[in-house]
From Swiss-Prot:
Keyword Isomerase: no
Protein family (similarity comment): Belongs to the KdsA family.
Primary enzyme class: transferase
GO (cellular component) term, any one: cytoplasm
GO molecular function: 3-deoxy-8-phosphooctulonate synthase activity
The protein's Enzyme Commission number: 2.5.1.55
GO biological process, one term: keto-3-deoxy-D-manno-octulosonic acid biosynthetic process
Pathway the protein contributes to: Carbohydrate biosynthesis; 3-deoxy-D-manno-octulosonate biosynthesis; 3-deoxy-D-manno-octulosonate from D-ribulose 5-phosphate: step 2/3; Bacterial outer membrane biogenesis; lipopolysaccharide biosynthesis
Gene: kdsA
Name of this protein: 2-dehydro-3-deoxyphosphooctonate aldolase
Organism: Xylella fastidiosa (strain Temecula1 / ATCC 700964)
Record field: catalytic activity: D-arabinose 5-phosphate + phosphoenolpyruvate + H2O = 3-deoxy-alpha-D-manno-2-octulosonate-8-phosphate + phosphate
Keywords: Cytoplasm, Lipopolysaccharide biosynthesis, Transferase
């Protein structure tokens, strides 16, 4: 499958989707995107910048949600033109999808909306590549009918993204078998290494996270074999306005990615026995 001008798949090198969880300011987005572009260019890693203009599913109604559609799209367009990288953002049921699609290169559907049939079809019908996040409440096998809904629109540029599964209250676990199962959808599989370490609602009015396990799960996923890695990053995670506890520090992103690129090459060198 071709995505933003490059090929993706298990027979292709790993690609990266990364950026701050939410748009905090134009300068933060430009600075972060610039650093990520420099890192990925040195590693020969294809890169898509991501950030959200509206976080509609915050734990608390008083939490920062983002700058909104109009300002958010201006920021994403600035990143795209000034830094020279493709951009991704998520949309919601109330979002004017066509308007967003005029700016971004990839659309993303939130995990909580994965079972909303009309929403999935409406997003995919626009014709842009779509990253569909698997709900925390969904088995990997249940992504197959979701993809069938998506592709019924005629859009074949569909990614499926694993972001952990609910495990009791306020906790997520990552079953690495799901990455192999989700390949059966016929879509490139992306692993979200940062939301997978989230502790939903674990800090009362906001979610917690265990960012120390981001490299652990990222290495495991790459060793299993994935097409892409999704990772939210921030220059100052403790002061990030959304999902700081599970954001990976920008200053150590290069070190993490160096390891993952090397591991990806080894993993894909001889193919996958489970597919024989």
């Amino acid at each position: 499958m071709k995505l933003c001008g490059f090929e993706v798949g298990l027979n292709q090198p790993l690609f990266l989707i990364a950026g701050p969880c939410v748009i905090e300011s134009l300068q933060l987005q430009l600075d972060t995107a610039g650093v990520l572009k420099e890192i990925t260019s040195k590693l020969g890693l294809n890169f898509i910048f991501k950030s959200s203009f509206d976080k509609a599913n915050r734990t608390s109604g008083s939490s920062f949600r983002g700058p909104g559609l109009e300002e958010g799209l201006k920021v994403l367009e600035a990143v795209k033109t000034q830094i020279g990288v493709p951009v991704l953002t998520d949309v919601h049921e109330y979002t004017p999808i066509d308007e967003v699609a005029t700016v971004v290169d990839v659309l993303q559907t939130p995990a909580f909306l994965v079972r909303q049939t009309d929403f999935i079809r409406n997003v995919c019908a626009v014709g842009k590549p779509v990253n569909i996040k698997k709900g925390q409440f969904l088995s990997p096998w249940d992504m197959k009918p979701v993809v069938e809904k998506a592709k019924s629109t005629g859009n074949s540029q569909i990614l499926v993204c694993e972001r952990g599964a609910s495990f009791g209250y306020n906790n997520l676990v990552s079953d690495m078998r799901s990455l192999a199962v989700m390949r059966e959808t016929g879509c490139p599989v992306v692993f979200d290494a940062t939301h997978s370490v989230q502790l939903p609602g674990a800090q009362g009015g906001r979610s917690g996270g265990q960012r120390e396990f981001v490299p652990v799960l990222a290495r495991a996923a790459v060793a299993v074999g994935i097409s892409g890695l999704f990772a939210e990053t921030h220059p100052d995670p403790p002061n990030a306005l959304s999902d700081g506890p599970n954001a990976w520090p920008l200053r150590t992103m290069a070190m993490l990615l160096e390891t993952l690129v090397e591991l990806d090459a080894v993993t894909k060198k001889r193919g996958f026995l489970e597919q024989d």
